[in-house]
Regions:
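Flexible, low-complexity linker and terminal segments
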Residues: 2-31, 161-241
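Glycine-rich phosphate/diphosphate-binding loops that line cofactor/substrate pockets in enzymes
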Residues: 8, 31-43, 90-95, 177-179
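Gly-rich Lys/Arg/Thr-decorated short loops/hinges at beta-loop-alpha junctions or inter-strand turns
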Residues: 8-22, 38-43, 62-71, 98, ...
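Metallocofactor- and cofactor-centric catalytic cores in central/energy metabolism, strongly enriched
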Residues: 14-63, 69-83
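Proline-rich low-complexity regions
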Residues: 50-53, 156, 184, 230
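Thiamine diphosphate
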Residues: 52-179, 190
């Protein structure tokens, strides 16, 4: 607050839009369409570190905590990008869908250690990394692209056209691709993609089968093959070649 005025943006209208169901028309920003698409995909947990142009994804979910609790979606504003990336470790042993977000390229550099381990081991549940790609836009310090990081770690990189229907479909397909290939997927969003206005036909949100309100019955058995450590890493590296 500043001189008694609350300077925080309210996402009350956007939160109501997240509740739209089958056949309803969603109208709003690209980044909020991504948020809606996550819920339609049955995401179980979302984490991240705020940074332009993807900040609103986490902001609206934090303000929608009551609705997230109702769906069973765990939302966490992380201390940095590395701790956000580490959250995706939940999808290594369990068939749960998770998404994390931050600004690239500096944020991706911070998360690189966790991302390398995640990409080596692979995932069971769909894992989506939503990148605020700001190359050439003028609000980033470092002018580098995320492509090199995705290439070195064998992470799929999706670059949706700035159209809300395409963006939403890309989120859905990214989870399917991640689960089919057992590999995390990056989706890069530029500033125009995040803030363009548009509309799409919504679908019902899906409550995750495993969530904060519907916890797993048994702990996953210990599997040394799912640890990024020799000799497991040799087999993991070989499996990446055959994706």
């Amino acid at each position: 607050k500043l001189y008694g005025i609350n300077m925080e943006r309210s996402f009350k209208k956007e939160i109501e839009a997240l509740k739209l169901g089958d056949g309803d028309i969603f109208e709003g920003e690209g980044i909020l369409a991504v948020t809606k698409a996550l819920l339609q995909s049955g995401v179980a947990y979302v984490g991240g570190y705020q940074g332009s142009p993807v900040s609103n994804l986490l902001d609206v979910m934090v303000q929608a905590k009551d609705y997230m609790k109702e769906l069973g979606v765990h939302v966490e504003a992380c201390a940095n990008e590395s701790s956000a990336a580490a959250m995706l470790g939940a999808s290594i042993n369990y068939p749960v869908r998770g998404a994390v977000t931050w600004k690239s390229i500096v944020g991706t550099n911070v998360a690189s250690d966790a991302l390398s381990h995640l990409a080596s081991v692979g995932v069971l549940g769909g894992s989506l990394i939503i990148i605020g790609e700001d190359y050439g836009e003028g609000s980033s310090i470092i002018q580098e692209r995320t492509h090199g990081v995705a290439l070195k770690s064998t992470i799929w990189l999706m670059d949706p056209r700035p159209n809300l229907e395409v963006i939403v479909r890309t989120v859905h397909k990214a989870f399917e691709l991640s689960e089919y290939s057992h590999t995390p997927v990056m989706m890069q969003l530029r500033i125009r993609t995040c803030h363009l206005q548009g509309k799409f036909i919504a679908k019902n949100n899906i409550k995750p089968k495993i969530s904060s309100t519907n916890k797993v019955g048994e702990v996953a058995p210990h599997n040394y093959d799912l640890i990024a450590h020799p000799p497991s890493t040799y087999a993991q590296e070989l499996s990446l070649i055959h994706i």
